[in-house]
Each structure stands twice: as structure tokens, then as C-alpha cells.
């Protein structure tokens, strides 16, 4: 009986090590790991005092990440006009990357007033092809430059 308890203790003591070793061993088999490189798609980035804050868009492997686009200096018009403007900007960024609106996988929409949800949807409708991407829409207290809407997305090439 004492020998059985000792064996169980040794086994249980080894379980955490196996949990760590198994995934590492599995990585060594099969296809080689993907090279972790990304490509900035535009040379300009938002900077403050010479320090880069973010990239407007970049690609990583076969994915394209487009950072939040707002109506910006063109922040005129109602929610429908601003949403169209923002989606046009996103479409330009995706084309630059070699992707398109129908290849978008995930969208985040930020509205300064949830009452604008229906108006935003009217401009959003049919912009992403036959199979629209998954989407999250949240209301926020404010957006830069007086924009009523900001949208970011992830697409594939």
C-alpha cells in the first residue's frame, strides 16, 4: 500500500511538468512555426513628440489589421454620412493591403450615441459582401475630432 501511495505521489508531481512539456514537444512536430513578421502598410503613423503611438494599418501573415478610423476632419454630416466616410477609408486601407471588404472577419464599431445605431446600420448594410463579418458595437462618451462613429477591423488577404 505504501508503494502505491508513493507511485501516485510521483505521478501527480510529474503532471505539471507534462502539461508544460507536451505542447512544446508538439510544436517541434509537423509544420514549422510561422515566421513572426509584420508589414506596415503606410509610412505615416500618429506621433506625439516624435514617439509613434500606432500604425494606421499593418499586415501580419495573411491577416490585415486596420486601426480605428473616424470621420476626423471630415466629421460633418449625420451618422449615415460619417459611417459611409469611415467605411470608405477602411476600404481604401484594405485595398492597399491587397484585401477587400468581403474579406473582413471582425469589426468593432464605436458610437458616441447608441441612438445612432440604426442610422449607422443603414450605411453599414451591404458593405461587406454576402457574408458580413462578426461585429461588436459599443457606445462611448466621445471620439476624437467630433466624430460620431469610429470603426476598426481585421481582414484576411
Regions found by a protein language model. Give the residues of each.
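Residue-level signal for inorganic ion chemistry
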Residues: 90
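Short acidic capping loops at alpha-helix termini that bridge into adjacent secondary structure
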Residues: 100-104
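N-terminal presequence-like segments and the immediate start of the first folded domain
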Residues: 2-84, 95-97, 112-157
